[in-house]
UniProtKB/Swiss-Prot annotation:
Its EC number is 7.1.1.2. It comes from Mytilus edulis. InterPro entries: NADH_UbQ_OxRdtase (IPR003918), ND/Mrp_TM (IPR001750). The chain crosses the membrane at residues 27-47, 53-73, 80-100, 102-122, 132-152, 177-197, 206-226, 239-259, 267-285, 295-317, 324-344, 372-394, 414-434. The gene is ND4. The keyword Electron transport applies. Keywords: Electron transport, Membrane, Mitochondrion, NAD, Respiratory chain, Translocase, Transmembrane, Transmembrane helix, Transport, Ubiquinone. It is an enzyme of class 7 (translocase). One of its GO terms (cellular component) is mitochondrial membrane. It is found in: Mitochondrion membrane. This is NADH-ubiquinone oxidoreductase chain 4.
Amino acid sequence: MVKSLAISLIALIIMKNLNVSIIGLSVLTILSMGAASVATGGVELNGLYSTDFVMGLMITLTLFVAILSYLSSAKVSRKASFNLMVISISLILVMSFSVSSFFLFFFFFESVLAPLLLLIVGWGYQPERLQAGGYMVIYTVFGSLFFLWGVSELYLSGMSSSMSSVGSLVKKSAMSLWWLYILGFLIKLPMYPFHLWLPKAHVEAPVAGSMLLAGVVLKLGGYGLLRFMLVMQVSLSSVFFVLLLSVNLAGGFYAGLACVRQVDLKCLVAYSSVAHMSLVLLGVLSNTLLGVMGAIIIMVGHGLCSSGLFSYVNAIYKMSHSRLLVMNKGGXLFCPVLVLMCFLLSSSNMAAPPSLNLFGEILVFGVGGXXSXAFLFILGLMSFISACFSLYLYGSCSHGKGLMHSESLNLSSLCDVFVLLSHWVPLNFLFMFMP
């Protein structure tokens, strides 16, 4: 299955027709959904590839977001090159989620930066996109070197490079620097205060780059951390572990506060990603069944919700030619359908029922409360501030008197509404298929 997906994606790279690529990705998404529903147990193939439910879920999310990013970029320039970049990112992400070796995972983990950087630099809006791309590369490459060092150290200490290895076979001295080994994942998530590259990359990236970055690329950090922590023997009561969780939750709350004072729509959605991914980090680091389940659910829910919000920002940018909140007021007057979709996605972003975010946050809140009452208090504050900045986003764009004359609803806007609806429907109905 994995080889077939890879070959099909390579074939789509060769094709220059955007419509053919969309149809091909749609077929691959349906096949991946079938694989995700069947592969409930873990199976390792040839020592290189593995298949399980999480892998199938992440691959399905990758292809689904790639399709919607295509639809949101119907009027992009240099379509052949754009097609090459997006399919290349999708192929590398599929391979990242499929491999069973930490060394191969590191290779694809870093390889995704190349087409993503070209997408930002080649189709970005402002001259500052070069600086944003430099920030992204420096941050992620620097952190990933520690992960490579950690995997090499564990391999030399007796553990194989397979993700199904047993960490208890490794010397405890090799495990002592586990917090340094996971630095690359913390940057990719990103965890506060390693998040500075993310708002810059989002602001300068085209809509497809923002959708893929927020929807899938950030999930590489959570997925890699999940696989790595399963083989690590980390004491949950250690002082450094508690300190890491405390900084993570405090940073998530501070990122939520930063959302409320943003004036740029893309920055607001980018900082909301930092706040939500801190919950993923808490669930994964708890190393419990409920925590890991909650983290996976939040990753899928956030992937759909954040991608949809970036698509919404692009839709109103095409009409008002500005990302500033003050320039996009009064949306309910000129495009009530888009405002309705903004409300639906904002409500899902604040974990309103029946969105996936609600079920994931309930599980993570339970794990956090079992660990410490102080953690539960901070999680409550994070939930409150999440509702605040989600309502702030909706209220700022829907009410008030607009300062610019915006274009009326046209065929392009109808396509944007379809893309937004395609994000919202699985986000609020996938709970019926949860195991």
